Amino acid sequence: MERRSFLKATGSAAAAAALAGCSSDSDSDGTEDEAGTGDGMDSTDSSGGDVGTDLKEDGDLWRVNTGTMTTMDPIEATDTQSGIVIQQMFDPLMNYPNSQPAVEGLMAADYEVSDDFTTYTFQLKDATFHNGDTVTASDFVYAFERLTASDNSSRAYFVLDSLGVTHETTTETVDGEEQEVYEPGTLGVTAVDETTLEIQLDAPFASTLEMLAYSSFSPVPEGMVGDIEGYDGEVSQGEFSSSNPIGNGPFEFDTWDSGTEARVSAYDDYYGESPNVDGVHFAVIENDSANYNYAMNRNADIFELPTAQYDPGKVSVEEEDDQGRQIGTYGELRNGATANYSGVSNIGVFYLGFNMASVPKPVRQAVAYAMNQHTVVEQVFKQRGEPAYNFTPKSIFPGGAQNYNDRAENEYPYGYDDSQLGQARSVMEEAGYGENERVAIELTIYESGVWSETASILRDQLQSVYIDLEVNQAPFNTLLERGRNGELEMYSLGWVADWPAPDNFLQLLNPPQTDTSLDFPISYVNWQPENGDAAQQAEEAYQSIADNPAPTEDAQATRNEAYIEMENANWEDVAMLPVYHELTELFWYDHVDFTPPAGMGPSRQKMNTVSLGERE
């Protein structure tokens, strides 16, 4: 079976949820991989005073998570906020150092790749888990099997589809239909000896090493959780995921009070660079005002600024480094301090998605004509990003950022830096709509002030083109659940890179993986052949990507052509309307010695190298 065709053949796709791959929209954080976040449910009042401070210690690094964490189990997490904490406790084979998009070995001391790019052999570093057990290759085998076979895994497709690890299938009846599903215990991941791990792929995959930097692939002590065949488990998965996660990272679990705070403490026997802080404390604050007040009261060392309280005129950029990070200062703040500042273009995209089973094509196109991405970024997001006209971010776009810009300016069919309401009205009238034949559409947004303002602008514009847009907000997790159940018509979400390649983004536009009748659709747009030729074009292009996975120039050229085909198909049918590419901005006080994250975002950064001076 061809790699990446497995999901189609089995009729199942894994739940993919921005974070990783995960990210934030400047108001707060909540990419699920389908990403989104907002200023949602309060964990405090707007004072931002004492929320999440019970566990704080003076020697801790104080952070804010702007969304609710859902799990501490690496195979289960799909949201950015959980990923930020998991990143501190679990070390996979590879790593994005300070979120730079070029990977380095982490648990891997060395590795070899076969001439046909299908066998990867890793030598492991000498490390221990937080319970004192030595990390062995068998622990990785067990962790990969959990990721693939556990009912608690949200990322089985990472192994079977994205990487394409060799495996066998068996026939099972699912909902009255026979399907080929993974046969437990057949995965091509082998412990050659205690410190040598071998991974066998069905076919080459150009982003294998980048994929293995994802925390889902982190080792877990063999037999710790009994949620796969052959293991009874020392703890239940519920306990492991909430109160007893055992990892191998620079910090170990201390405690977690869902919706309020979490803390990890420095692990004394860490094999790498020992943490410079006693621990990291995360206050969970989803409300923008509370988040801002918390930081202004100096309860956070490193923080974000909600867009409502952000003034672009207070940014002073002093340098731009080789990772594209703009470094400088911001201030002064409300509390009189001048903060350190960093801004970097995130490898991600925020967009409006359409359930094509319920929103007709003329309506989708009319929304695209009405949307002026430049206006949204400048007036609503206060220039904290770049207008998005392609789904793939600029830094990884085929042909580079210049090709991205050229396509946007010269080929985007719905108006570059222009709201074309006349065209929107025409396409609706041609489809039979008018003042006496209006259409009502529900737009569900995650709880975010900036998305609420964007939706209001769009709603007012669409009134004149016979579309009555009803805007409703939902907590992030509720929005995702409704999406997976096919209950959304139009929605706001985002996606940030699991690995820095276009196929990681364009998989959301692979029609078979958008079917919400599946258990875990990767996106919620229901792009089916009955929608027209563009769906077939997108599906064939994605299959071309899957058929040419090798890290060679010829295969890359073929993939690049297919990437553009998928972008064009999305332009035609408007399955997803790109809105903006986020600028990740962080702020920190002078007592913090901190290298800010690069393009892979905060959820990929470990905090063991951060140092603290004396707080004011």
Give the residues covered by each predicted segment.
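N-terminal lobe/hinge region of extracytoplasmic solute-binding protein
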Residues: 64-113, 246
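Aromatic- and charge-enriched surface segment that lines or borders ligand/interaction sites
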Residues: 109-156, 291-294
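Extracytoplasmic/peripheral linker and loop segments enriched in polar/acidic and small residues
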Residues: 6-7, 112-113, 190, 417, ...
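Append "and occasionally in soluble cytosolic enzymes with long acidic Gly/Pro-rich linkers
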Residues: 359-460, 465, 565, 614-616
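Long beta-strand-rich cores associated with HINT superfamily self-processing modules
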Residues: 586-616
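Ligand-site clamp/hinge motif
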Residues: 239, 263-326
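Surface-exposed binding/hinge segments that line
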Residues: 160-227
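Gly/Pro-rich hinge or "lid" segments in bacterial periplasmic/extracellular proteins
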Residues: 195, 204-207, 212-281, 289-290
